[in-house]
């Protein structure tokens, strides 16, 4: 999982989720796209 200052969708399969005040991008098909903001 990459930690970035700004997270963006990289493909149509990406889902943006907020958990515990953090923003995550989650992708089940291509796990390389997983990101966390902060």
Curated annotation (Swiss-Prot):
HAMAP family (UniProt xref): Ribosomal_bL36
Protein name (record): Large ribosomal subunit protein bL36
GO cellular component, one term: ribonucleoprotein complex
Domain of life: Bacteria
Native species: Acholeplasma laidlawii (strain PG-8A)
GO MF term list: structural constituent of ribosome
This protein's UniProt keywords: Ribonucleoprotein, Ribosomal protein
PROSITE patterns on file: RIBOSOMAL_L36 (PS00828)
Family recorded in the similarity comment: Belongs to the bacterial ribosomal protein bL36 family.
Keyword Lipid metabolism part of the UniProt annotation: no
GO BP, one annotated term: translation
